[in-house]
Amino acid sequence: MSFFFKRTFGSINKKIIKSFRKIVEQINALETKMQSLSDEELADKTEEFKRELKNGKTLNDLLVPAFAVVREASRRFLNMRHFDVQLIGGMVLHNGMVSEMKTGEGKTLVATLAAYLNSLEGKGVHVVTVNDYLAKRDTEWMSKLYNSLGVSVAFITNDLTDEERKEAYSADIVYSTNNELAFDYLRDNMKFSREDMVQRGFNYAIVDEVDSILIDEARTPLIISGPVEENNQIYKHIDKIVTKLVDSDYEVDEKGRAVFLTEDGISQVEELLRSYNLISEKSSLYDAGNMIMTHYIDQALRAHKLFTADKDYIVKDGKVVIIDEFTGRMMEGRRYSDGLHQALEAKENLEIQYENQTLASVTFQNYFRMYNKLSGMTGTAATEAEELRDIYRLNVVKIPTNVTVKRIDVDDEIYGTEKEKFNAVLKFIKECHKRLQPVLVGTVSIENSEKLSALLRNHFLRHSVLNARYHEQEAYIIAQAGVPGNITIATNMAGRGTDIQLGGNAEMIAKVELKKIKNADEREKKYQEIIERVKRDKEIAMKAGGLCVIGTERHESRRIDDQLRGRSGRQGDPGLSKFFLSLEDDLMRIFGSDRMRSFLKRVGLKNNEAIHHPWINKALEKAQKKVEARNYDVRKSLLKFDDVINNQRKVIFEQRNHILGNEINDLFEVYSEVNKSVMESIVQGGYYEDYVEDIAKEFHIRYGITLDKKDLAKFLNKQEALDYINGKVKEFFTEKEKYFNGQQTTDLWNTIVKQVMIMTLDHLWREHLSILESLRQSIGLRAMGQKDPLNEFKREAFLIFECMLERGKELTIHRLAHFKLVDNQEVGGRLHPTRKDNLPKVSRNDKCPCNSGKKYKHCHGAVTVMN
């Protein structure tokens, strides 16, 4: 973040907080009045606010009384009163900004203020969480508050049916994950009926852990895909070839996440490919006919040299499951595209699944920008404030803590090797454990968490491990990390959304320990014992120094490190944070500067000796800033390309919705355009009368109608002939409509037209996405010809899109013209377009029939080649 931006950001932040404090005073002034209301009178306020909105008041006009009502309802039904700083957080959310609040400051409670106020409009509010557990937990927890005010609330998780989802989306406030919301959007736009759609629009979203969702996951598109049958054995053969390569056969670029074959490597691969009869004796790897082999080789190299088991993915139940690099969570159901997942399956000797074709996709960047109003909450957003502002138009406001943070952040310790580092971590944990100080150790991978776990076991130190393998116990493990003497090892996921309370979480403990007790009196007695025990344990933990957070490696992003530190020192509790690093860590090895390396060599590191130096801390921060800046540039570049696709996606989805929501009996506009296009492609620049026979033949193939050549020859120009043809085609479709509507179902033709239009549009859109993805991957080479790849992509994507729309009209009319019912005796029998499209054969070097001016092989012919 630039000095200027920091300075500006700081001054604006102060002004916003100052202006909101004045509104807090107005809310506080209503507290006594709200406390005097009965439960019924408090609930009646919701209807009163709705009436005032109808009478012309705005949500801003109602903010003060609405926030006062929510605070009082929370005090009564949740036994929690919003602090003044939480009211400020609620105002930040309502104003479409990001509220940065430290861990333990009650973000879940803050969201209720803005959610309630915005629900009064009746357009729906989405509260977005990072996992199903939090969506369900927050709904159940906050439902007492919402229900007491007559506001409906629901949650959406991945196990709900479409009917249940539709009902949930109709609630005033909906809690769900970012994945569920975006996938429901894609699924809705693949439905064949509006009644089957589950969502009801994009009014207002509050995104919890906004940095994780809008930044960390921004590069990953959400894809709904279907399998494409192919010969999967090729992946097995290529995997065997790649495992035979030696270090001199390839170069690994860890920064750019790429692997390249050397000259020796190319020769070796060609020799091995010939031995498997995958290429001919005389051909080379880069011959036109063998280009697909380079794709398989590239993916196999990436699978072996860039992707590590238990770090980037794990093998579970015979499947490769991706691990989110930022959260450490398993991403079940997600697969890498472009054959990479198949390459990993071959590497791990698993059954290879079919490669998938994209049916629909969207990025979180473009999904969340569809909301009329967007806001977010997180404990760490300041480092990414510039990106949130530039891409999402979200300003970040740092909310003051309710109590001053007392956590001590100690300088990093750097060791020569990973082994020395882990030994130092072990020694430090022992010291903390001796004084009963609770310890949370953060690791960047499952591999490291299990390595450290084995080390602790060897020294008889009891501990809990939290990583993608054991994510089911996440909430309980992390909630008990504050118990005196407890040692918890966690990957980056670190239980975001679950508070670490010193002494332990009484509610969580009670949920587990009271399960088997049936007697009400005994349950109450046991519950009181738990409360007392937690109180005593909190005192012990505080005397020991509070929660000690240990980082075993710096992450690429400072924000992830800050999130780990932020687990300690909640609500004014004491705490400590310290990072232990080694020269073998990824960040030091890949991104550390030459200056830092030479400095460390000069200083010299003896066995088990650590370096403490403020300059090293600054150098590390500089390396992290470099990586953050690079990642931001990547995300910004991807967004520019995705915006092109997103604009086309909007057009397609709007067309789809228009088709689903309207009666479509008159096809004149569609077929008249198609007929004009066909006429132009036949006549081109020649004389109309020279092509009468070709015209009659072409339209007979397309519609099965016979055009009198003598009649056609009478016309003076092609426009007159076109009017005549359109009239004949109109008669043809009128007869077809009468026939189908006479099959006991009066509006069958309209249904047929809609279904064919939708199926054609979906089919072409799938092919279009595939073509655009190939174009995007290759367009970077245009830079070598002094052309801007983005402008080239925009230009070509537009031409291909126009071609696709024209092709859609042509294919729709053709399919409708040849449409038949499977069985006329079945009322509304299965609709069955004839499988073969009898359109005229086009040579690959001819101009494309869609009139784009491009050769067929570079336009619609590309679809055939790709598939």
UniProtKB/Swiss-Prot annotation:
Subunit text: Monomer and homodimer. Part of the essential Sec protein translocation apparatus which comprises SecA, SecYEG and auxiliary proteins SecDF-YajC and YidC.
Name used for this protein in its record: Protein translocase subunit SecA
GO terms for MF: ATP binding; metal ion binding; protein-exporting ATPase activity
Residues reported in the UniProt entry to bind ATP: Q86, G104, E105, G106, K107, T108, D499
Subcellular location: Cell membrane; Cytoplasm
Enzyme class: translocase
GO biological process: intracellular protein transmembrane transport; protein import; protein targeting; protein transport by the Sec complex
Manner of cofactor binding, per the entry note: May bind 1 zinc ion per subunit.
Enzyme Commission (EC) number: 7.4.2.8
Main location: membrane
Named cofactor requirement(s): Zn(2+)
Key words of the record: ATP-binding, Cell membrane, Cytoplasm, Membrane, Metal-binding, Nucleotide-binding, Protein transport, Translocase, Translocation, Transport, Zinc
Reactions catalysed: ATP + H2O + cellular proteinSide 1 = ADP + phosphate + cellular proteinSide 2
GO cellular component: cell envelope Sec protein transport complex; cytosol; plasma membrane
Topology versus the membrane: Peripheral membrane protein
